[in-house]
Amino acid sequence: MKMSKKVLSVVLACMMLLGAISCAAYAKTSAEADTHLQFNENGEFKILQIADMQDGFPMKLVTKNLIKKAIETQNPDLVVLTGDNINGTAGKSVTYATAINEFMSIFENYGVPVAAVLGNHDAEGSITRAQQIAVYEKYDCFVGCAGEDMGNYTCGTYYVPLYSSTDAEDMIFNIWMIDSGDYNKENDLGGYAAVTKEQIEWYKTAEATLTAANGGETVPSFMFQHIVVPEIFDALEPADETTGTCSAEINGEMVYYKLPEGAKGVLPEYPCPPNYNNGQFDAFYENGNVLGMFFGHDHNNTYEIDYKGIKLVNTPGAGFATYNSENIGVRTITLNENDLTTFETEVVTYLNLFEGDNAAMALYELNSDTTSTWTKIVAFFKYLVYAVQNLAGNFQF
């Protein structure tokens, strides 16, 4: 399976001719983005998915600590941000830039590559999605781009090729980064946006082009986006009040779901996909090259569900400035180039990362939605004590 960099560059450049102004006016195309990533010398490639930080400037210290600790302990080859990276309601360009810098500067300092898509909250202010992507592109660590212009309000749909550890010109895996939009502008059904028909057609064309350039052999892949696909309800198992782990009132009646047998993770939160479907999952399913589809959006869910041969995966939120649970954390996804028909993934929570760290645990108690007001008051004073102790321990007499 071999696709040279030269062939891939020509493929990307030709596809860029389809681009228009709304995205391209602000940001780089895929052909201009530095996306040359290889499996490591052990034949592995580890992705760190960070979802729903949803903070501003300044970012909460506890969230920053989570991100730094995750990078230091998990040693990822790529960080993937899956939207609601910031709280977009501030609506000022300087606020957007400084909010994005709060986490992008961390990745820059660690020297870890980053790809990103936006969520429904990122651009709720006056700054467009294209303008935000342009901010990301100012960082050397960013390997994403605005991608092809789809003729609508989305921006940041592209792909990131991964190359063999032994051959820098052999593309053996692909990562689809899809902008799932924000709120429904297509019809009167309300709710969240669905991936558009134009994006789906772009995917089909891009996938066919990559397959042809790869000698007719499809390239295995992942897909990352913010909002889960509507098929999640087909993948889940209907339940009742006693067996359901999540519920919502739909058309005046309570509806319950639970994870199907064999699924991993938890489902405490009722999923929030679009109310309509443009056929995204079917397109990925029909092409048969997608191992897993990874989402954020529903902050408390951590499920992994096999559905029609594709694993649907939700990653919990990483931000303490928005609603959260004891599962707040990140997700690791590890590939081995010797068998690209499967992968390993796990959620790494804040509590996992900082077990035994008294100061970090006090900071968690101070910021977590899971703790009472009294616990937060006690945690504040505990954190002060631990902080003073740490300062004293580091002071050189």
Segments predicted by a language model, with ranges:
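Sec-dependent N-terminal signal peptides of Gram-positive bacterial secreted proteins and lipoproteins
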Residues: S4-Y26
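Sec-dependent signal peptide cleavage junction
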Residues: A20-A33, F395-F397
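N-terminal active-site segment of His-dependent metallophosphoesterases
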Residues: A27-T98, E102-F103
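Extended active-site neighborhood of metal-dependent phosphoesterases/phosphodiesterases
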Residues: S30-D34, A99-G216
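Active-site environment of divalent metal-dependent phosphoester hydrolases
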Residues: G56-P58, N87-A90, A116-T128, Y183-E186, ...
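Metal-dependent catalytic neighborhoods of phosphoester/phosphodiester hydrolases
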Residues: M59-V62, G83-S105, D122-C141, A235, ...
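His/acidic metal-ligating clusters that form di-metal
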Residues: Q74-L78, N174-W176, L189-D298, T302
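Binuclear metal-dependent phosphoesterase catalytic core
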Residues: L162-Y163, I175, P271-C272, N278-N287, ...
